Amino acid sequence: MTQWTDLFLLMPLSADGLHGLLFVTFGLHLLFVLLMLGTALLGLLFFLHNRRGCDGPQLWSRHIVDSHLGLKSLAVVLGVAPLLIVQVRYSHAFFTATGLFSYAWLAVIPLLIAAFLLIDAFGHTMQARAWLAVFCGVLGVGALLTVPAIFTGALSLMERRGEWAAFADKDLGAGFAAHWLLRYLHVIGAAFVFGAAFHLFFSTADHPEKAVRLRNWLFGATLVQIVIGIPLVFSVAVGLDWPVIGAVTVGVAAAMLVLRVLRPAAPSSVAAGPRSLLILLPVLFVSMLVARQFLQDRSLAPIHEQAVAARQERAKELAPYREQALAAFTAKLNTVYDNGYTLYDGACQPCH
């Protein structure tokens, strides 16, 4: 007992080391989450489009949905590391926000189980029982879309300490609600962008005629992302500084170049997307991830530092009682328990 400590505030690495690990692990997790969401959304939309008799058999829709299995497995597995790192680095804010979000937070697991089972059933029934496929697909994708709503809400609340008391009183502030909605829509838009890009390069080899539709989805989703991103930036204006502004600027520039490459007047191959997308989309993804990391660290690091300072003050208050506590603790350690008298005094005597 050489120091008074709090296990939740101890960190196995330096803050910078944890930030680096969080950036890498969360980036990988988010990438596969976006691919998984985009695949589920596009698979359902293409299936419903074909149901109207526009494109004949559902072979390509089934091909899109079949890739969901591997993507969802990677998304779930890669999500463990960033979740654990956030619990260690920002324990006070994390456990407070998830406690306030407790019912929704606990619903994540059953929602994921239901979504994955329904989407698998959707893929297996789309050619045999179309009505059952519609039922499973709509419910499965709906359940899947609820999960990022919960996560973005919890993260938004975690980063806004001033909203904790109001949220506990069931008072959802207009600013917080708007930021939550914009953040959620931005995630869904990103899922369309990266899902369409993924299948543009990896699912059109045997169906080159589908590339045009995926290019259109990619163009439209990127344009919508820019529109949503403008008010989203204003919703975090308090935390803006030059590193964040620089990262956002790089991301916007990359998005504009993506639109230029994909513009309807641009020449294109029906077999695949422009190779420049293989550079522009990673730049767009990393730059926005950098901006998010800076914003999160700016808002959460002071909360952790305040908790550490409170622990140190508490340690000073308890310091005069340290010797007394150690004496009582040492007396207990010196007690011999392998005799009948001690066992009787400690266990039997209170009742007999």
Language model: regions and residue ranges:
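C-type cytochrome heme c attachment motif
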Residues: 342-352
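Hydrophobic cores of alpha-helical transmembrane segments in multi-pass inner/ER membrane proteins
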Residues: 32-44, 105-121, 185-201, 249-263
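Alpha-helical transmembrane segments and their helix-start/interface "positive-inside/aromatic belt" motifs
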Residues: 21-26, 58-70, 125-145, 212-218, ...
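Membrane-interface interhelical loops and short amphipathic "cap" helices
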Residues: 1-26, 56-60, 82-103, 154-182, ...
